[in-house]
Amino acid sequence: MAGLRNESEQEPLLGDTPGSREWDILETEEHYKSRWRSIRILYLTMFLSSVGFSVVMMSIWPYLQKIDPTADTSFLGWVIASYSLGQMVASPIFGLWSNYRPRKEPLIVSILISVAANCLYAYLHIPASHNKYYMLVARGLLGIGAGNVAVVRSYTAGATSLQERTSSMANISMCQALGFILGPVFQTCFTFLGEKGVTWDVIKLQINMYTTPVLLSAFLGILNIILILAILREHRVDDSGRQCKSINFEEASTDEAQVPQGNIDQVAVVAINVLFFVTLFIFALFETIITPLTMDMYAWTQEQAVLYNGIILAALGVEAVVIFLGVKLLSKKIGERAILLGGLIVVWVGFFILLPWGNQFPKIQWEDLHNNSIPNTTFGEIIIGLWKSPMEDDNERPTGCSIEQAWCLYTPVIHLAQFLTSAVLIGLGYPVCNLMSYTLYSKILGPKPQGVYMGWLTASGSGARILGPMFISQVYAHWGPRWAFSLVCGIIVLTITLLGVVYKRLIALSVRYGRIQE
């Protein structure tokens, strides 16, 4: 995590010019070092939270089938959605908690919940019946633990100046992206243990390819708690970098500056929540649809789709990290609002390119109508292509666009180059929109406690991750990619219009009240 240190961390955030009185009094070297040590601990917390989510994603379906053969794809949808539901409920609660109590409290409690959830996940083989419901509870608890994202971002926003904000938010997003990338890698490293693995009879613990990743995640969670207790300190600064009093800080000194007053622009707050919802909505539906889309368009087997799309998503994750690094530099020249607008336009172009054109049609699948390409009902079935049991054999399964989907007969094929170009553009625009939404949001809120507001923003993103797959599964199954991606393009156009309407209002609270020049 030390590599994430950037220029804004290396320069003292004090006065505007060296030698001025403000340069000497705004922040001591000891306070500065303590502040950034605390922020880096939260970088690690975000990374570990992302790893905890993604480390089992590729194995949930086969593990669910193993512990409870009665589980079907419809129930799988609830298992996947339970994480986002838990996070959506918990984020505002943890955010409110962090506004009035030391941030260590909600952070430690949330991580303990995640550790407990991982331990429950490792023992899902113990109950004699209803094991699938225990998995539902385990994933829901993990989502509740992930509600600490609101605390992490609100702390970082409150502990950085406007000058440092974009860079620090980019670092958090990079850690989150790295966690999503490396989680499946860790999962792969444990596949050599196999489904049976070994059993520790004394504590009835099965150590196999399904349980080892969550046990590792639980261990890292305990390590994270120790680091939080040892290193994290309460720090708050105003938009200029002056230390502020905080109810979270038990030893606040009397010479610290009071938090500047000013009313938050609620229109701007609501607008950013909508923008953030759409950002996560469109990427969640893209992640969901690429497996059935590629199986329909290119006659890939399920195994090929999982492998190739896994590589594509991993590449998009690496692309996101590079984008975060570039945005930190670009934002200093053209500002966050313009970058957000550019990101939305790039995403729109990406989905527009996905629209099918021409006279060539996909291969039609005439046999085995009950295939896994793209059923037309449940949320769980739409994402079933993301999981594949090692015991399954795809060699004899028919491939192509299922005749059950009437649109296969008249919808042109989406060429592979067309799909890859679109993926690159969406992978470029999404991290930009994600980062700029958080950054602008934190600046609009100003130096006041942001826990509740960050909680609502996180909750809106969680809701988007639930609704996005549900939306795309229904539209794609019934009307095909032309209608599905046309509607997405329309949603993005409306979002760009909203951004244009509120563009001038998306400014920092201190800039709005003239305390700082933009």
From Swiss-Prot:
Inhibited by chloride channel blockers 4,4'-diisothiocyano-2,2'-stilbenedisulfonate (DIDS), niflumic acid (NFA), and 5-Nitro-2-(3-phenylpropylamino) benzoic acid (NPPB). Residues 62-74, 127-131, 195-211, 288-304, 359-412, 473-482 are extracellular. Keywords: Chloride, Chloride channel, Disease variant, Endosome, Glycoprotein, Ion channel, Ion transport, Lysosome, Membrane, Neurodegeneration, Neuronal ceroid lipofuscinosis, Transmembrane, Transmembrane helix, Transport. Residues 1-20 are annotated as: Disordered. GO terms for biological process: astrocyte differentiation; autophagosome maturation; cellular respiration; determination of adult lifespan; gene expression; glycolipid metabolic process; glycolytic process; glycoprotein metabolic process. It holds the Pfam family MFS_1. It is found in: Endosome membrane; Lysosome membrane. InterPro entries: MFS (IPR011701), MFS_dom (IPR020846), MFS_Domain-Containing_Protein (IPR051068), MFS_trans_sf (IPR036259). It is linked to Ceroid lipofuscinosis, neuronal, 7: A form of neuronal ceroid lipofuscinosis with onset in early childhood. Neuronal ceroid lipofuscinoses are progressive neurodegenerative, lysosomal storage diseases characterized by intracellular accumulation of autofluorescent liposomal material, and clinically by seizures, dementia, visual loss, and/or cerebral atrophy. The lipopigment patterns observed most often in neuronal ceroid lipofuscinosis type 7 comprise mixed combinations of granular, curvilinear, fingerprint, and rectilinear profiles. Macular dystrophy with central cone involvement: An ocular disease characterized by decreased visual acuity, slight pigmentary changes and color vision abnormalities, becoming apparent in the third to sixth decade of life. Fundus anomalies are variable and include bull's eye maculopathy, severe atrophy of central fovea, relatively spared fovea with surrounding atrophic ring, central retinal pigment epithelium and/or choroid changes, pale or atrophic peripapillary area, pale optic disk, relatively spared periphery, and slightly or moderately attenuated vessels. This is Major facilitator superfamily domain-containing protein 8. It comes from Homo sapiens (Human). The lineage of its organism: Eukaryota, Metazoa, Chordata, Craniata, Vertebrata. The gene is MFSD8.
